[in-house]
From Swiss-Prot:
Region spans: Spacer: 177-334
Pfam families: DNA_pol_viral_C (PF00336), DNA_pol_viral_N (PF00242), RVT_1 (PF00078)
GO molecular function: DNA binding; DNA-directed DNA polymerase activity; metal ion binding; RNA-directed DNA polymerase activity; RNA-DNA hybrid ribonuclease activity
Name this polypeptide is given: Protein P
Gene Ontology biological process terms in this record: DNA replication; symbiont-mediated suppression of host innate immune response
Record's miscellaneous remark: Hepadnaviral virions contain probably just one P protein molecule per particle.
Species lineage: Viruses, Riboviria, Pararnavirae, Artverviricota, Revtraviricetes
Gene source species: Woolly monkey hepatitis B virus (isolate Louisville)
PANTHER family (alphabetical): REVERSE TRANSCRIPTASE DOMAIN-CONTAINING PROTEIN, RIBONUCLEASE H
Gene expressing this chain: P
PROSITE patterns: RT_POL
Record-stated family: Belongs to the hepadnaviridae P protein family.
Amino acid sequence: MPLSYQHFRKLLLLDEGDPLEDALPRLADEDLNRRVAEGLNLQHLPVSIPWTHKVGPFSGLYSVSTLTFNPQWKTPQFPLIHLKEDLIPFIESYFGPLTSNEKRRLKLVLPARFYPKATKYFPLEKGIKPHYPNDVVNHYYQVQHYLHTLWEAGVLYKRETTHSASFFGTPYTWEHKLQHGTQPVNVQPAGILSQSSAGPPVQGQCRLSRLGQKSKQGPLATSPRHGSGGLWSRTSATPWRPSGVEFTSSGFVCHSARHPSSSINQSRQRKETNTSYSSSERHSPTSHDLEHVLLPELSSESKGQRPLLSCWWLNFKHCQPCSDHCLHHIVKLLDDWGPCQHHGHHFIRIPRTPSRITGGVFLVDKNPHNATESRLVVDFSQFSRGNTSVSWPKFAVPNLQSLTNLLSTDLSWVSLDVFAAFYHLPLHPASMPHLLVGSSGLPRYVARVSSSTNSYRNNNNNGTLQDLHANCSRHLFVSLMLLYQTYGRKLHLYSHPLIMGFRKVPMGLGLSPFLLAQFTSAICSVVRRAFPHCMAFSYMDDVVLGAKSVQHLESLLASVTTFLLALGIHLNPEKTKRWGKALNFMGYVIGGYGSLPQQHIRDKIALCFQKLPCNRPIDWKVCQRIVGLLGFVAPFTQCGYAALMPIYTCIQKHQAFTFSLVYKTFLKDQYMHLYPVARQRAGHCQVFADATPTGWGLVMGNQRMRGTFLSPLPIHTAELLAACFARCWSGAKLIGTDNAVVLSRKYTHFPWLLGCAATWILRGTCFVYVPSKLNPADDPSRGCLGLLKPLPRLLFQPSTGRTSLYAVSPPVPFHRPGRVLFASPLQPGDAWRPP
């Protein structure tokens, strides 16, 4: 028989009805719950009607949304972020000694370390994920530009050789110990011949030096090594700057110097290049030994031929165009395309790093509200699954009640935005080989994505470039012509292969959120101790400050901003928001009245119910998305999570769920009328409840009550009923009980009707645990009133979450002057402390 909505509300005790001691135990009856489920069409029976796979914006939890490429994306500009290395002494000079907990958390990131037991290496062709098949070339260049921007900002290392890397920025102490110096091992890239190398040809100057012997002639013979080996001398009179010497990922290539009066013919240069390629294939250099290629003898048989350079891009300048869309026309636009590669200001030794990657990258919109800027997505998912998975450390996430207890105060609030928060935390160089990103170069990437013949790679391995025009096409020509207006001569630089490792903590790693949460929570703990009359709280990169007046808040903001900037933390002043008394934080609006969800979440729920169909089976994957949205707001409704249990059951069984009209109306009424989650108050417990399978007992001050059930009930159900009776008849918001299930406030495993009603009755009620021997309601629950036991003095303290996110800061030592850097409107004795 169908059930009307009014009768259903009355059944759940949401409206006035029968006496509580009679109506509430009936809700635990299994037969009644079954009949109500039949009346609401919630039996979860298999249906033959086709499932609905899309409800409004929800299309299933596992459906992959199509990414949209924006050719006009702007790459964000990153400053040279350098967190102070002597962080702990610097803070102690500001605010006095730190606690051991604060020191422990700060040491985790100075530097951070990541050493997985196993790492998979992938070919460079998989460095850039092909998520935009229609914009392959544009996406490639934007990713290359983004990676170079991060490298120049000191976020990435650039792999120079198997055992060396270069970077920009200020070196840390642990990098000084591994530093090569400021002179790069290779200055002359492939295909770019030195303009200052006038003089005789280099025949006889290069000797085969595989075992580390010094060359007998030329500038390469005067570079002494350090005693430890592997470090290039910075004090040498003739540093490693050979003319026309290229160091590639596979070896060294020597090119002859170009001079107007040079007698070296171009046929020899072609043979020289081929010999260099074959030699570099046979021998891979190490960090201790340089291998110099012996140049072949001169030949005069092939005069007039152009040299075949090892640079794919520059070879188009000397070749004949194959068509109107040949890349030769683009390369001829400039006479000087610049070097094939750049080097950082500093060089360091690194562990053996192969010419491969460990994670792919691609670009997306910066956020749903900003499609003009791009964001680099790094996929290091290999460390979260399979044989290379890593067990990430767990850290506390504040729940709704803890946030409300902590932040629901009559303070004025301001939120700070930390610019590129993850890129503030330095990584040890030994972690670089596990966090590699890059690309294989333009020709190999285009050939792979377009599924064309990979002739360039094959012929390049053989030392020839006969199929130079294999990738010439109208699409590539038009794309490069348009990109030339944006990048200019950088088209050449970005067309080369690139391998980079992270110098700062990447966002795509499971370890990063833990490190950032520990770091920001330690900083806020220091701020709270320095300004005990104020409030500072952080979760990840969200930092909020609170004070009792607007003037006080502005002074606090100025002092904290100066302190953070002194630490090397960059803030985004454009995103600093002043909220007044209502703080918007983590999706909630938190004020003196309590917490409520933000308006944009309410709008999503209203749209969800508007699009939700009735009497049609909905795919359980779509139900997962719907429940994910409704579950976030469930604590603000009358019946909480218990009202969603029919949908949860279908999801667990992988069955479609059908919304009846009454059930949809019930949920819509629940979510259109929200109640704030109030802040809990400390106090002494005066009301106690206890139950047995056959009876219940209450103690309310000097008053005692007892009763019996019509039939024996499970002990947890009986304890829950006793707590509901105590809340309704005493009106107390603090109740003592000895049942752990009632204390947990998780009522989703009780009979559905009872769980919904109990959630509404016990809303806003706090529980405190009392042992059974000390529970004064234990005797009344067994039917024995007897003498009244003295009430135990139980103090309830509201929870503010785990100590890793919020810890009570010790006061400033008395022998130090006050660290408040402004005239505080509060008296020193009126120090406000978080609840």
